[in-house]
Design a protein with these regions (language model features):
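Cell-envelope/extracellular polymer assembly enzymes that use nucleotide-activated donors
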Residues: 17-19, 50, 186
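Glycine-rich, basic loop-to-helix element that forms the pyrophosphate-binding segment
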Residues: 76-92
Length: 253
């Protein structure tokens, strides 16, 4: 059941260009770096940015941190990342939607690149490529083990941070709320298909993010290769038990 509270810290600024949506479930260890990266990327767009932190069953200091950065705060208790992100998009007032995970940092040039891509009229939106905070053989092969099956199932896409006009986000009904995992790849595929129908390309901004290695730090760099069932569940997309274990009930992820 959805439990969505009225947003607090609502931004009444006019002419908001970017609405940046962050789903957050107990992210006190990571979200400051994410918000600091957004602040740096936003310097050329003063008073044109709103950051919406969708608080998901938080029991730590995530809400307090979001408040200290003057973010718009919205509570949603669904164990479903699609519903969490869509709740943020629903209240967004910007013409451009950007979604980023709380353990990810955007590049300083990220917003200017999004602005450039969309202003060209050639792109429907897109994703980014990036890097992990650290790399090892285990992390490298784990990434390959995920990427190759995704390419076969969803085609040539990029994920990580998504960006598109809000009107296009709404046209494809946002993230698929029937999916509990791999909802990002599904969103990318549908956005790309929507772009083709409108004679626009799906764009990929290179070197657009740095993401944490928290799962590798917790479980080991080779853990994914030792447990291929996780990969199969991810590709399936609607395995509730695996989704809860991997994301929604896991405080050490």
């Amino acid at each position: 059941m959805t439990d969505t509270n009225e947003p607090s810290g609502v931004n009444f600024k006019k002419d908001v260009k970017f609405s940046i949506i962050i789903p957050a479930h107990n992210e006190e260890k990571y979200i400051r770096k994410c918000l600091d990266s957004i602040a740096k990327a936003s310097e050329a767009y003063k008073d044109q940015i709103e950051v919406i932190v969708v608080l998901n069953r938080c029991t730590d200091k995530t809400e307090e941190i979001a408040k200290s950065y003057n973010c718009i705060k919205l509570k949603n208790n669904d164990k479903n990342l699609s519903k969490i992100r869509n709740a943020g998009a629903k209240i967004a007032s910007g013409e451009i939607i950007i979604t980023i995970d709380a353990d990810t940092q955007m590049a300083e040039s990220m917003l200017s690149n999004v602005d450039k891509y969309l202003a060209s009229g050639k792109y429907i939106g897109g994703g980014v490529t990036g890097k992990f905070e650290r790399i090892s053989l285990g992390i490298f092969f784990s990434a390959i083990l995920i990427i190759i099956p995704l390419l076969f199932r969803y085609g040539a896409i990029s994920v990580g941070i998504f960006w598109c006009h809000k009107k296009d986000f709404m046209e494809i009904n946002g993230f698929n709320e029937n999916m509990l995992m791999a909802e990002d790849a599904d969103f990318a595929k549908r956005l790309k298909e929507w772009g083709k129908r409108n004679n626009k390309k799906f764009g990929t901004i290179k070197n657009g993010m740095i993401t944490s290695c928290r799962r590798f730090d917790t479980y080991g760099d080779w853990a994914l290769l030792k447990n291929p069932k996780v990969i199969l569940a991810y590709l399936k997309g609607n395995d509730r038990k695996s989704a809860d274990k991997t994301y929604y009930d896991n405080q050490e992820r």
